[in-house]
């Protein structure tokens, strides 16, 4: 589904929070939305790999990697598995890699930077905890809407129809 975040902000000014502009789009889909599954980790992609192995049910995986650009938390293998398992997208407050391959995948992917060095995979991190970055607090099951203009957050699904 295509979203217009500007229009959603106009229609629901009291229901949405705007995430500060900090992300670059790396995936093949520039507009996406859904409810959140949250991972908090630092330079470790193990919990990400475990989580995207399950059916995403059209949800968005939000990764709080502390904004680190030293090691990529998302690579082509992770993104492809997420796409195959019905994840709507991945929003990574951290780095990604294999950018050319990511652009070819039919999934939304946002990250703060790209770097060729991959993260370790030890499984250290937290699943479905509140996280705060970009001027907002994200809670599990909140709803995120993304297009080329920006990223907005709502505690409830917005009536788009």
Swiss-Prot record:
Record's keyword annotation contains Zinc-finger: no
InterPro entries, per database record: RraA, RraA/RraA-like, RraA/RraA-like_sf, RraA_gpbac
GO cellular component: cytoplasm
GO terms assigned for molecular function: endoribonuclease inhibitor activity; enzyme binding
Pfam families: RraA-like (PF03737)
Source domain of life: Bacteria
Keywords: Cytoplasm
GO BP terms: regulation of RNA metabolic process
Region forming the signal peptide: none
Cellular location(s): Cytoplasm
Classification via HAMAP family: RraA
Quaternary structure and interacting proteins, as annotated: Homotrimer. Binds to both RNA-binding sites in the C-terminal region of Rne and to RhlB.
NCBIfam families from the UniProt entry: NOT-MenG (TIGR01935), PRK09372.1 (NF006875), RraA_entero (TIGR02998)
Membership in a protein family: Belongs to the RraA family.
Annotated protein name in UniProt: Regulator of ribonuclease activity A
Organism annotation: Idiomarina loihiensis (strain ATCC BAA-735 / DSM 15497 / L2-TR)
Designated gene of the protein: rraA
């Amino acid at each position: 589904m295509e979203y217009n975040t500007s229009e959603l902000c106009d229609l629901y000014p009291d229901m949405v929070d705007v995430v500060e502009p900090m992300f670059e789009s790396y995936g093949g889909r520039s507009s996406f939305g859904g409810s959140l599954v949250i991972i908090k980790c630092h330079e470790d992609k193990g919990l990400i790999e475990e989580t995207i192995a399950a059916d995403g049910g059209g949800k968005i995986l939000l990764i709080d990697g502390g904004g680190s650009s030293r090691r990529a938390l998302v690579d082509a293998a992770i993104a492809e598995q997420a796409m195959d398992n019905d994840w709507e997208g991945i929003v990574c407050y951290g780095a990604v890699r294999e950018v050319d391959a990511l652009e070819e995948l039919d999934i939304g992917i946002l990250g703060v930077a790209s770097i060729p060095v991959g993260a370790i995979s030890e499984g250290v991190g937290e699943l479905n905890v509140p996280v705060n970055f970009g001027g907002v607090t994200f809670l599990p099951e909140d709803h995120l809407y993304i297009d080329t203009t920006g990223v907005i957050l709502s505690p409830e699904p917005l009536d788009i129809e």
